[in-house]
Amino acid sequence: MLLLSKEDIKCVITMKDMIEADKQAFKMVVDGMVDTPLRTVINGKYDGAFLFMPAYAPELDAAAMKVINIFPHNIDNNLMTSPAQTMLIDGKTGYVIAMLDGTYVTQLRTGASSGAAFDLLGKKECKKGAMIGTGGQAAAQLEAMLAARKLEEVKIFDLNEERCKAFAEEMQKGLAKYGAKIIPAKDSDDCIEDADLIITVTPSAKPVFDGTKVKAGATISCVGTYEPHKHELDPAVLPRASKIICDSKEAALSETGDLLIPIAEGIITEEDVLGSLGDVINGKIKGRENDEEIIVYETVGVAAQDLVAAKVIYDKAVEAGKGLRWGE
């Protein structure tokens, strides 16, 4: 079995690689080429939750299981908010062939989901980005946004002003190669003002921005909400949106309050949720048709992403001779 750390993975994969891997995963889901049961969630103490996400793809001769645990208060103790491990299994023998740092893989593939959405649904010419939230997923989300479009500026907002400022400074240095200014915003209104691309990545149970202030032509990726009673997306933006698209329509309509709450309140219907990003890739549904429409992308994550990401990373690591062999 090959053990792959965060540093091993960094050596063999780029964000653009991950965006393409996510596109492959989303296409496989809508093509029926991967078995991805809905995740199992066990709610624990301390506002924590344990998530189990299996997937199997005969075409890849591989299966995967990710265990990811969501503990939002970890950030107060300088701990990761979503520790995880990803297990890659040989589809021919059933042997576990790799164990990957699932926290980092999750950060990459979740960020890449927004990147794939922006690449497929965003305007071709975008100048400004906005991101609300600075937790464990935020850095990869920001990089994916920058990898998808050449931006001049990205504003960051978090309720913790000190953490927001420190994050912006760290990202300005760490993502300097993309050439964008990364600056802290005064508030959420300031953050999303004139933004072409918007990411929300928070554990909030209530909307984190004013949906009436989203500009025409914006693409919004909602990342943080995975429970029916939580909604970080302001429902006010939904009637203004020409399209609502998900990473998985089935999963999103089973899990996220961003959609379930406005559906229950009669603001939108299930039919307003057009489909999955894989349907856009396949041409089954249209993506962006003009530079004025607002498009909302809802991502809850599907196990196919973990499987494809783990397989791509594993193959590249074997080729590059990276990782630690264990039990052989």
Question: Language-model segments: which ranges?
Answer:
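N-terminal ligand-binding/catalytic initiation module
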Residues: 1-107, 115, 125, 275, ...
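Short helix-loop-beta connector
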Residues: 121-128, 150, 215-216
